[in-house]
Design a protein with these regions (language model features):
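Short acidic/His/Gly/Ser-rich catalytic and metal-binding motifs that mark active-site loops
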Residues: 91-94, 121-123
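Second-shell loop/turn segments in exported
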Residues: 94-102, 131-134
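Short beta-strand-centered interaction patches in the first periplasmic/extracellular domains
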Residues: 78-81, 87-89, 124-188
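Assembly/oligomerization scaffold segments
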Residues: 1-91
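Glycine-rich, acidic and aromatic/proline-enriched surface loops and short helix-turn segments
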Residues: 104-121
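Short intrinsically disordered coil segments
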Residues: 54-56, 98-103, 183-188
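Generic alpha-helical secondary structure
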Residues: 102-109, 140-144
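Alpha-helix C-terminal capping segments
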Residues: 57-58, 113, 161
């Protein structure tokens, strides 16, 4: 059986809540933040707010780092708090206007991260330089994806932007392949 640790940091206080009914973690390949949903039992110690940090680890491996975006009480059990946390790609739903020239898609993503104070991990150099581009009142997802789409058309290389446990990461999809075969024998 796997050892699952869920931690909420509220200010300088580290909380280990009692989780009810399991945890749901989901990711999409593009255009959506990672999402962690869970329910916790409210006790005399548990006190946290929207914006507090959440970390999920399984068997000692960090799987998710994000922030509480919604919390609500269930009508069926008033002492249970239903929580949805999202990784920092949630901020890529913000809209902004960017005018840039002579930048690679990796540079555009780094520029957005710096402007919005987001943590950056490994951003693979996308190589292709975009001559100029204007993005008017577009989501940060669209701005980043448009730069990645131009790179795909020019270099035929597909890059994936994701949040790797609290760090924006950009990686060539070819380097993400696993030596894994799923067939009738492996799934049971």
């Amino acid at each position: 059986m796997s050892k699952v640790d869920l931690i909420i940091q509220s200010g300088s206080t580290i909380l280990y809540p009692i989780v009810e009914e399991g945890i749901s973690l989901s990711w999409d390949r593009k255009g959506s933040p990672g999402k962690l949903k869970f329910s916790v039992v409210k006790d005399s110690v548990l006190s946290f707010q929207e914006g507090d940090a959440v970390k999920l680890s399984v068997d000692g491996t960090d799987m998710f780092y994000g922030f509480v975006f919604t919390k609500s009480r269930s009508g069926r059990a008033p002492n249970v708090i239903e929580v949805t946390a999202s990784d920092q790609l949630r901020y890529f739903k913000n809209k902004d206007t960017y005018v840039y020239s002579n930048k690679k898609a990796s540079d555009v993503i780094k520029m957005i991260a710096e402007d919005f104070g987001l943590s950056v991990g490994a951003l693979e150099d996308t190589g292709y330089v975009i001559a100029s581009r204007t993005e008017d009142n577009a989501t940060l997802f669209d701005i980043a994806q448009n730069a990645l789409d131009e790179t795909l058309r020019a270099k035929t290389k597909l890059y994936v932007l994701y949040d790797k446990v609290g760090k924006l990461t950009l990686q060539d999809i070819e380097s993400m392949k696993l030596n894994l075969l799923i067939d009738a024998d492996t799934i049971g």
